[in-house]
């Protein structure tokens, strides 16, 4: 079944948007942020890749800030705390 990932994420003024697309062989987590919204510090139990579809975010990991814009991606190791701050309206996977 064909699905368009960007159509799955609807930005909300009241909170960040989280959409999980999964089947037995993979999981994609879509995140939508309005400017100023935050994905609080957390860890992941498996390696992950963060991809910025549109917008710009500040990604913090190991005390280092990384500004990521549309098209950028970042490899996140397992069990390392990280967080995301939306600098503008943004969509990530």
Which residues fall in each region the model found?
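Conserved short histidine dyad/triad with adjacent acidic residue
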Residues: 27-44
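Ligand-binding loop in jelly-roll beta-barrel domains
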Residues: 78-93
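A cytosolic small-molecule/anion-sensing beta-strand core signal
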Residues: 53-54, 69-70, 88
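Glycine- and acidic-residue-biased ligand/ion/polar-headgroup-sensing regions
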Residues: 46-57, 62
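A short, N-terminal "cap"/entry segment at the start of jelly-roll beta-barrel domains
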Residues: 1-25, 60
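Short acidic-glycine-tyrosine-enriched beta hairpin
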Residues: 63-78
